[in-house]
Structures are given as C-alpha cells and as structure tokens.
C-alpha cells in the first residue's frame, strides 16, 4: 500500500510541475533523477491524494509519464526495465512545454467524462440484497481497521496496480489451474457496460474467503454476477489470473473431500468487501486487441512502449496440484508503466467479459463448480442437479416408468425397422372398435429416445391424428341448454358444432386437444390441460387429476405403498371415475379381475378383438396414454365398453337358469271391498328360491358401502311407515338385495299397466270418512244460515224481489250443491272405499267462461226503445266428486252490453284431482222484475219517504210477493209451503270435459233453456301438483359434444324422481352434491317419451328423448325448438327397464300438459 501511495504522489507532483512550469526549471537546474528522488521522500496525506481526483485508480486515456519508487528487492530484468523507463521518462520531460497547459486541462476533463463512478448507497439497495440477509461486514460486526478504515470503500484495492507483498513473504510459483472458478452473481445486472478486467480483483489472499459466502461489492447480495477466476490455457502468453486461496486449496484436494472443505471454509472470515463498483463505458473493439481477459483477477504484465510486445512478468514453475497446500498470500510483482499508445491501453480494457444474462445466472449459480477445465468466460449452460430424493421421486413415478418403457419399445422397433408384435399381458388395454390401429412411422420413431425431453415441434410426431369412421348425422339438433324447466347439461352451448357439420376427427386418438376435451368432460377435477404443455408436465398433471378424481376405497388397505410398472395395465383398466366398482368392499378379492374380456392372440402375435379388428399395443400411442392416465377406452372417462360383457354377466350365463318368484305383501284395509289382484306368470315352470349369495352375484354393477347404507336406511323408513296400499319406493336395477324383484317382468307390468296394482292411494278410508263428515257438518251450518237470510228477505216487503234476496238465494244454491256432492261422495266411499289415483294429481282452472244468449232475445232488447222491466240472474257451477265451485252471480244486462255474450269473470278451480277426472260445468239462472224500491226506502234511512208502488205480476196474476218467483219454477211447486225455504235457481244447461281438452275450446251445452244458446267457450289451465310416482336409480351413458364438435359418451348415475332425471358422476354424490345434469320429462315432445335408436347411433343399447326447449333467438322470445337427448343403458335388460319407466313417467306428466304445437 505504501508503494502505491508513493507512486500516486509522484504522479501528482509531476502533473503539478507540468502545469506550473516547474518542469523546465528542474531541467535546467539539475538532473531529473535527483528531483524524482527528492519527490519520493516527501510524504503526502491520503486526504489530499483522494481529494484531488476520485478516479485515480483508472489509467488515463493518454500516456502519463511518472517513475515509481524502485523496490528494494528487484530482479535483474526489473532493474533493466526500470532503467529503460527512466530514460524514456527523461526524454518525454524535456519535450514537454508549458504552452500545453490549456490542452492538459481539457484532457483531464475528457478523462472525467469517459469514466463513470457507480456508487450504491446502503439505503438504496435492491430487494434481492435483503432477501439473503445483511452484508457480512455489517452483520458480523467487523472491527478490523484494514476493512473499516479503507479510504473510499476499498478503492485502493480496486486499483489496477499490483499489491506488493511484505519483505518476508516468499513468492509463490503457481502452475496453471484447471478447475472452474467460483461464480459471483450481482443482484442487479448492469447493462450497456463492459466490465474492466480487474474490477473484481478485490480479494485479499491473507486470510482467505469463504466459498459459500456470496457477498459482493454491492453490499452483501447473495445473487451475483458470474465472474470466473479460472486460469488461462497453455497456449496463452499472458497469465492475467489471480488465484484465490480457497480455490487453491480446493484444487489441491481430491473430489471426495470437496464437501468437507466447503464446511471448513464456512468458518473462515471474509474480506471481500467494498460498496463501490467502477466501470468503463463501452469502447468499440479493435483488431489490435491482443488479450481477452475474462475474470476478476490481478493483471501481471509488463508493457513495453517501444516495441509493443507483451511478456510474462514471472516464471511459472510447474507444481503438483495434488500435493500442494498453499497457505500464504498471493504472489507479488512490480508494475512498471511506460509510454504506450492508445491502442495498447485499449487492448487491455476492451477485452472484458460480456454482461451476464439472467438465465445463465440461474442455471450456473453455485458456490463452487468442480469441472476439469473451464474457459475464460462462464457462458456454458449446465443442467440443474436434483436432490437424490427428488430424482428418485421423478424417476419412480408411474407415468415416467410407462413413458420410458414405451420409448424403449419404440427405439427397439425403429432399430429393427419392423414393428414387433405385442407380447401378451395379463390385462391388456382394449382399443375402441371403431378406431383404426395407429402405427408411428420410422421417421417419427427416430425422434424418440429414452430420457429425452421432446421439443414442441416433436410432440406432433408422438401424437399423430388419425381419422375414424363418421357416424350418421342426426336429423335434429343434439344439444343441451340451460333455462327454467328445460334440460341443463354442463359443458355444452347452443353455438357449438354438431357431429354432422364437419368431417369428424377421432375423439381422443392421439391429439392433445382431444385429450384435453376428454379430461374436461370425464375427470372429476375439471382442471383443463394446455395442449402445448410438455410431455412431463402433461403426465404429472394427469397423475394428480387421477388421484383427486378417484376416491379412496372404504375399508381397504393396500399392501403396496406405491403402484409398480407391472400393474399399470390392470390398474388403468380398473380406474373408473363414474363407476364405483373399485370402491366396493365386496369386490376386494376380485380386484385383479378386469372389466373387459382379455383379447386372444393368434400365432402371429396379432390381437384378435370381438369384431375382428387388429390391434397393436405399442403402435397405438393414444391407447398407451389412456392407460397411463387411467382413462377407459378413448373418449369416455370411466365408461365401460358396451361391446364387452362384464365378468359377472358371463358367470351368470354359465349358471343354470332359475326363475325367482317374488312374494309381495300388501297392507290392506278392512273397509276396502276391492283388493288389487296380482298377476301371475303362466309361463313359470320351475319355482324355487335362490340363495342370497347367488342373488348378490347376479348383479352386474358394483356399488359402494355408502350406497348400501342408503338402501338400508330407505328400507327402515319404509318399514316404519304404515301404508294402505302398494307404494313404489326407490329401486335400483342392479342392487344385489333387490335386483331380482326389481327387474322382474311382473314388477314392470305393475309399473306400466293396470291402474289397480300400479295405483297410489292418497288417504285411507278412515281418514276420508272423517274428512267428509266434517265437511258435511260445515255445509249444513252454511245452508241453515243462507236459509234464514232468504226467509228474512222474503218476509219484509221492502226486500222482496230485491238484490239482497237473490244474493241469499245464490248462497243457498252454493251450499246446497256442495252439501249434496259431499253426501254423494260419502255414500260412494262407504260403498267403494277410498279413491285410487293412477298417476300424479293435478289442478285445473277454468277461466274466461262465456255463454252465448239467444239471438231473438238479444234482438228484441236492442230493438226496444226502453229498457225491459224483467232481468235474469245467472250462476255457473264447476263440479267433480265432492268438490264444487260456484261462480259469482251475473245479470242479463251485462250480456246485452257485450253483444249477447254472458261472461263469468271469476275463475273456477278444482284441486288435487286425479288425471282420469271428468268434470262438469252447469249454468243456473232465474227471472225476476227490476227492483223499484230505492236503497233509502229499503233500509228506512232519514230524509226518505216510503211510497207503496204497484207492480205487474210476474206470471200475469197474483200479488206482489210473487215477483221473486223464477220463470222456470213450476207454479204448483211455488204454491207449496217449501217454496220460501229453497232457492229458485234452476239448471239451464250443462257440459263435461276431461284432461284431454285443449287450452281454449268451444263446447256445446246439453239441455239448454231459453234465453241461453247451446254454445259455450272457456279456457282450461291444467297443472300437476304431484310429480310422477315412479322412482328409479341406475347408470346411464349420456352423449355429449366436445368443443371441437366431436361426440363423447360419459357414464352417469341417474335418479328418476318426480318426473325429473338427475345425473351425478357417482352414486355417492346423490344427496351430498348438486346434480351434473337435469332433464324434466314434462317437456317431452311425445307422451311416449323415449324411443329406441336403431339406425343413427352406433352405441349399443341407446335411446333418445325429444324435448321442447325455448329458442335462444332474442327476436322470438316465446319460440320453442325441438332438441334430442341421446342416452344409453348398460345392458339390453336395463334398456327395456329404462324405456318402460321413462315412457310411463312421461305419459303421466304429459297428461297434465296442454298439447304443444311447434310454430
């Protein structure tokens, strides 16, 4: 350090002498050597030195002439070089003139502009500097003066001059190092600059530095810029490398002791501190560049200005690195600078390394890299090293093992240039029958090597697209849309493509987008996979989706902690997200049985399927992916192939046929005279019970424990409830305890035919008796009240023939008719028992009831000049069974004002009636004279005078009391004593209607009486208050379209309840999760509901249901369109069961619906 300060002071003295003209005086008075010697003996303070210029570390752009102090220990070469430098210095000093004072200032100003001082304050550090902790110098409490008291933040340590060691320190002759240097990464990469070759040479070799400590000149940041400290190759002339102490020790040891060395070096303090970074602006590279510096090492060269040749400063003695143990400081040398040209200076500066990139820093970041040889620039990428546990987890995954096996097979087949036949396995994966076999070409197989990451452009060779046979186009649009009371299915929209619009492409056959679509419709997670994802990420995501989609088995413990590669075939075939067969505890012993039939192999090794299609396992990449990911046969997620029979069904075929007779017990009430008759099968020849074990094994589908518990819970609820007749409960076509009884033909006949056995009794006979008795008592009281009001109105002359008297007669008519209907129903109940309702009950509402009046009566009133003195009162009655509803009373004046149409504005209603009802509408009326007494006279109000008025008799004779008599009453009956206690309303016409009537229709009345005409019009609104009484549970496959317009069959758990078909992914989801799809059977286009598909759908056991749905067109908000829903059962027997139940339910629901006509 002292020698450097002396050199700097001498340089400053020379500059001051040149500016003040002292140079010429010194030349005249004495030799230059004595002046330089006297200048060397003067001591300058550090404050003055660094106060003069903050950039005294860097060399100027123009030659600077000064002579440093000669070292005490020099070599002969050094002495000779010193003499040459003194001679050149004398010549330059004589030629200098004081006239260049102004130009010298401009040169100094230019130097300041060309250099840049980047000072990073400790309070303005980036975020990354704090993520790894504070600076070591601040955190460990550094107190050494050499570190804390260094002027300008270790500025002298960054000087291009070489630090000279003490006298006692011996020189170290080091050989060429072949190890890779430690990587230093800056927190903030500095761009648009070229780093000086020696700007990072701030390491102190006395105590050494920790290898793991990554503090830098930016204040302790852990992520730094990579700077190599490796040595040059043998062919290089200059060795501008600074070998640090720790690298020397690491190079001396063997590779086995590297970790131990790193742990020992962590305890050593670090002196690589300094908050400043000096850099030079970019200088264009020149052809005269002689060296290429690449590391933060100390320059050790001697530049000759006369000849421009570069020679080595010291001699390098060869030394064995394996036995060398260096514990001393770095080597020493003298630095002699002479007059050189700008090109020679730029040759050292412009060869700095390029700025470090962020990507390289991430891949190369490591405390120490152990490589045999390293270049001068750390630009070589290296693969990231995983930990042993992570590597074992990645290499041991199921999908990775399957991928490696598949690539190995492809490699073998490509080397032989012949596709080898597949070896028979215990449980091979079946291929869909409508898909052609897939065979990759040799060119495609050449890209596939084991343990090779496929690039994006190579994935298209691994998954080629293969077309399949197109299905016939569907006549009607097949889609699902969501609105109220319309079918709803997730994953489909109205604007999606149909199967017949474009040429179909294989769904899920070697295309990532199709594979993504299968996951969207089939997996339980619903997480989409990007089609451009790499193969490894694709497999990893598929494994996660498979684990989350398949619940754990209840009561089952796996003996193996992880799946092996040998069990992938059977494991992939059993992984079914829709069917819970793998979750049943009853099938633990049958876990190894595959749900598909094992294909046969011929002598040539080809796989022979049931329909004769050849398959080759290693050639079908889509089949391999489906197997590895846990899919079942191509486009279906968990849909078993309908072309193969389940193993349980094959066992059932081998068993001798036996017919099971179900004994049904029914709770019958003693008061019921008629009992439902059970139909017996005349074709039954052998009748014997089947054991419980065989009954369980006859089921074709497995269920989970939760499903069995649900059935048991439903049984307990049914046993605790006392019913008056047979009630259809929740049934399942394949549940083992109930399979034989629910799929028998006898039960189907009970569900679909015969109102006696398949009917529903709403209430018992006792309850019906009690209810009707109470209703009769109420109506008797109301009849008595109406009778008293009518007698009171007739006894008083002021109310005789008034509106109040006719209101009392209307009330009397209403309650008398209700009482009469209740008595009739009570007699029927005692005779026939409670009413049996076949199907859901409903409600009808009759509105806009209008009756045409006789034309001659309307014409006479219109032609008359004054209003007629007679008036007619009318009332309408709607009746069915014990229910009677009476309309408000209207007069003939309202009909005359409406062109002869008599309207009843208040609607009539019947509630809770069976679908086989037949209701009757009756019109009652009577004739009377207009009221002549005013309101004040009737109620004897003040300021009113009672005036008796004579009236014309109604029948041409009699007193005024006869004015309230009806036109239609018999004179003999009117003269009897009971005429004052009965209503004078008489029947003028009647007509009937049933559930098949349209919404608004004209009816012809029978027994019509003047002044009514026999034409009536009304609007009937029918609405079911009960859903369908059929409840059924089972599996159904649903046809859906993907985003590309392709078809996909997905298996769902379906529950038919209350006329609605609800779909879930699994049986356990029912009652705990919301349904995936809903279809209301009341929207069926036909009352038959479902029909079998035989010509347009290749899926076996399929059927379709046509429904009405509102149009999505905003211009026609009330428009409807016809949609078709495609479904499929598992077996032919299940198909017949579903068709019978759906058609019966649809028929029951459509009976309460008005006929829909598509406009």
UniProtKB/Swiss-Prot annotation:
Residues 287-327 have a biased composition (Low complexity). Signal peptide: none annotated. Strongly expressed in dividing neuroblasts under the ventral epidermal cells during ventral enclosure. One of its GO terms (biological process) is locomotion. Residues 1029-1147 form the PH domain. This is Anillin-like protein 1. Its main location: cytoplasm. Disruption phenotype: RNAi-mediated knockdown of the protein causes 100% embryonic lethality. Abnormal polar body extrusion with large and unstable polar bodies that often fuse with the oocyte. Failure of contractile ring to transform from a disk to a tube during meiosis. Ventral enclosure defects and failure of neuroblasts to complete cytokinesis. Aberrant microtubule-directed cortical myosin polarization. Residues 50-60, 564-584 have a biased composition (Polar residues). One of its GO terms (cellular component) is growth cone. GO terms for molecular function: actin filament binding; microtubule binding; small GTPase binding. Gene3D superfamilies: Pleckstrin-homology domain (PH domain)/Phosphotyrosine-binding domain (PTB) (2.30.29.30). Residues 421-430 have a biased composition (Pro residues). InterPro entries: AHD (IPR012966), Cytokinesis/Rho-signaling (IPR051364), PH-like_dom_sf (IPR011993), PH_Anillin (IPR037840), PH_domain (IPR001849). Keywords: Cell cycle, Cell division, Cytoplasm, Cytoskeleton, Developmental protein, Meiosis, Mitosis. SUPFAM superfamilies: PH domain-like. It is found in: Cytoplasm, Cell cortex; Cytoplasm, Cytoskeleton; Cytoplasm, Cytoskeleton, Spindle; Midbody. Required for contractile events in embryos that occur prior to mitosis, such as cortical ruffling and pseudocleavage. Promotes membrane ruffling by organizing cortical patches of septins and myosin II. Not generally required for cytokinesis in mitotic cells. Required for the asymmetric cleavage events that extrude the two polar bodies during oocyte meiosis. Not required for meiotic contractile ring assembly, initiation or closure but is required for the transformation of the contractile ring from a disk above the spindle to a tube around the spindle midzone. The keyword Cell cycle applies. It holds the Pfam family Anillin. Residues 660-684 have a biased composition (Acidic residues).
């Amino acid at each position: 350090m002292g020698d450097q300060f002396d050199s700097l002071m001498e340089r400053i003295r020379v500059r001051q002498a040149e500016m003040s003209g002292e140079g010429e005086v010194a030349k005249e008075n004495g030799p230059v050597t004595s002046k330089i010697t006297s200048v060397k003996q003067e001591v300058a303070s550090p404050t003055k030195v660094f106060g003069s210029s903050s950039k005294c570390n860097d060399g100027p752009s123009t030659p600077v002439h000064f002579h440093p102090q000669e070292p005490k220990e020099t070599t002969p070469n050094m002495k000779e070089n010193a003499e040459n430098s003194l001679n050149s210095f004398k010549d330059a000093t004589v030629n200098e003139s004081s006239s260049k004072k102004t130009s010298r200032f401009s040169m100094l100003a230019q130097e300041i502009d060309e250099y840049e001082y980047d000072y990073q304050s400790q309070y303005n550090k980036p975020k990354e500097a704090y993520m790894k902790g504070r600076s070591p110098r601040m955190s460990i409490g550094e107190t050494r003066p050499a570190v804390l008291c260094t002027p300008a933040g270790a500025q002298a340590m960054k000087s291009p001059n070489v630090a000279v060691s003490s006298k006692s320190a011996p020189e170290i002759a080091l050989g060429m190092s072949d190890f890779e240097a430690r990587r230093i990464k800056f927190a903030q990469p500095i761009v648009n600059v070229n780093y000086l070759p020696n700007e990072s040479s701030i390491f102190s070799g006395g105590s050494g530095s920790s290898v793991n400590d990554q503090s830098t000149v930016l204040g302790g940041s852990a992520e730094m810029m990579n700077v190599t400290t490796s040595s040059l190759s043998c062919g290089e002339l200059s060795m501008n490398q600074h070998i640090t102490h720790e690298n020397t020790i690491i190079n001396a040891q063997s590779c086995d002791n590297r970790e131990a060395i790193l742990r020992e070096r962590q305890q050593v303090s670090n002196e690589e501190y300094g908050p400043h970074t000096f850099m030079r602006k970019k200088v264009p590279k020149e052809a005269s560049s002689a060296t290429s510096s690449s590391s933060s090492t100390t320059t050790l060269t001697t530049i000759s200005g006369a000849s421009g040749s570069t020679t080595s400063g010291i001699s390098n003695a060869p030394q064995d690195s394996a036995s060398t143990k260096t514990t001393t400081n770095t080597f020493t040398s003298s630095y002699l600078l002479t007059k050189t040209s700008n090109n020679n200076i730029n040759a050292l500066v412009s060869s700095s390394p390029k700025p470090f990139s962020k990507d390289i820093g991430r891949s190369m970041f490591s405390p120490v890299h152990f490589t045999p040889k390293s270049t001068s620039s750390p630009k070589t990428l290296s693969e990231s090293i995983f930990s042993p546990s992570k590597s074992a987890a990645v290499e041991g995954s199921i999908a990775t093992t399957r991928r490696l096996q598949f690539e190995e097979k492809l490699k073998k087949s490509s080397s032989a240039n012949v596709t080898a036949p597949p070896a028979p396995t215990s449980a091979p994966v079946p291929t869909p029958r409508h898909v052609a076999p897939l065979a990759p070409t040799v060119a495609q197989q050449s890209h596939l090597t084991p343990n090779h990451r496929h690039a994006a452009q190579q994935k298209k060779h691994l998954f080629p697209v293969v077309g399949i046979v197109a299905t016939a186009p569907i006549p009607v649009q097949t889609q699902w849309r969501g609105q109220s009371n319309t079918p709803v299915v997730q994953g489909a929209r109205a604007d999606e493509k149909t199967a017949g619009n474009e040429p179909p492409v294989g769904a899920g056959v070697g295309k990532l987008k199709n594979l993504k679509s299968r996951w969207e419709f089939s997996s339980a997670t619903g997480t989409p996979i990007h089609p451009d994802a790499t193969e490894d990420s694709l497999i990893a995501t598929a494994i996660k989706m498979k684990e989350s989609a398949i619940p754990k088995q209840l009561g089952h413990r796996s003996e193996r902690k992880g799946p092996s590669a040998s069990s992938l075939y059977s494991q992939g075939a059993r992984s079914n997200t829709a069917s819970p067969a793998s979750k049943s505890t009853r099938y633990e012993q049958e876990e190894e049985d595959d749900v598909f039939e094992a294909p046969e192999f011929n002598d040539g090794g080809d796989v022979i399927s049931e329909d004769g299609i050849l398959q080759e396992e290693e050639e079908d990449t889509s089949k391999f992916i489906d197997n590895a990911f846990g899919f079942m046969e191509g486009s279906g997620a968990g849909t078993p192939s309908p072309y193969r029979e389940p193993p349980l069904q094959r066992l059932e075929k081998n068993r001798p046929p036996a017919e099971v007779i179900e004994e049904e017990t029914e709770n019958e009430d003693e008061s019921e005279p008629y009992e439902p008759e059970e139909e017996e099968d005349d074709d039954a020849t052998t009748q014997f019970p089947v054991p419980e074990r065989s009954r369980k094994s006859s089921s074709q589908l497995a269920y989970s424990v939760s499903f069995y518990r649900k059935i048991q819970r439903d049984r307990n609820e049914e046993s605790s409830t006392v019913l008056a007749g047979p009630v259809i409960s929740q049934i399942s076509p394949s549940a083992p305890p109930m399979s034989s009884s629910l799929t028998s033909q006898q039960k189907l006949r009970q569900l679909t035919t015969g109102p006696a056995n398949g009917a529903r009794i709403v209430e018992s006979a006792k309850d019906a008796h009690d209810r009707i008795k109470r209703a009769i008592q109420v109506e008797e009281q109301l009849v008595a009240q109406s009778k008293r009001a009518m007698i009171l109105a007739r006894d008083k002359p002021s109310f005789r023939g008034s509106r109040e008297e006719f209101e009392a007669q209307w009330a009397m008519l209403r309650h008398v008719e209700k009482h009469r209907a209740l008595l009739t129903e009570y007699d029927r109940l005692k005779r026939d028992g409670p009413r049996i309702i076949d199907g859901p009950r409903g409600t009808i509402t009759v509105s806009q009831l209008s009756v045409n009046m006789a034309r001659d009566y309307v014409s006479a009133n219109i032609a008359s000049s004054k209003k007629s003195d007679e008036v007619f009162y009318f009332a309408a009655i709607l009746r069915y069974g014990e229910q009677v509803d009476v309309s408000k009373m209207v007069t003939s004046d309202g009909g005359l004002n409406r062109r002869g149409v008599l309207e009843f504005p208040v609607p009539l209603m019947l509630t809770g009636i069976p679908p086989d009802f037949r209701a009757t509408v009756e019109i009652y009326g009577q004739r009377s004279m207009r009221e002549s007494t005013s309101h004040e006279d009737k109620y004897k109000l003040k300021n009113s005078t009672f005036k008796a008025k004579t009236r014309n008799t109604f029948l041409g004779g009699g007193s005024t009391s006869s004015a309230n008599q009806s036109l239609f009453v018999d004179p003999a009956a009117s003269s009897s004593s009971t005429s004052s206690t009965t209503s004078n309303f008489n029947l003028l016409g009647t007509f009937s209607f049933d559930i098949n009537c349209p919404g608004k229709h004209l009816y012809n009345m029978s027994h019509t009486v003047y002044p009514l005409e026999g034409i009536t019009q009304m609007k009937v609104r029918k609405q079911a208050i009960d859903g369908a009484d059929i409840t059924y549970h089972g599996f159904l496959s649903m046809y859906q379209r993907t985003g590309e317009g392709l078809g996909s069959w997905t298996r769902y758990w379906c529950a038919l309840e209350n006329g609605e078909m609800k779909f879930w992914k699994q049986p356990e989801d029912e009652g705990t999760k919301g349904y995936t799809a809903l279809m209301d059977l009341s929207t069926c286009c036909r009352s038959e509901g479902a029909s079998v598909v035989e010509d347009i759908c290749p899926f076996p056991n399929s059927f379709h249901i046509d429904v009405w749905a509102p149009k999505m067109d905003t211009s026609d908000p009330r428009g409807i369109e016809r949609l078709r829903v495609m479904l499929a059962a598992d077996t032919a027997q299940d198909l017949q069961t579903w068709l019978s139940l759906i058609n019966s339910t649809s028929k029951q629901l459509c009976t309460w619906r008005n006929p829909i006509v598509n406009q």
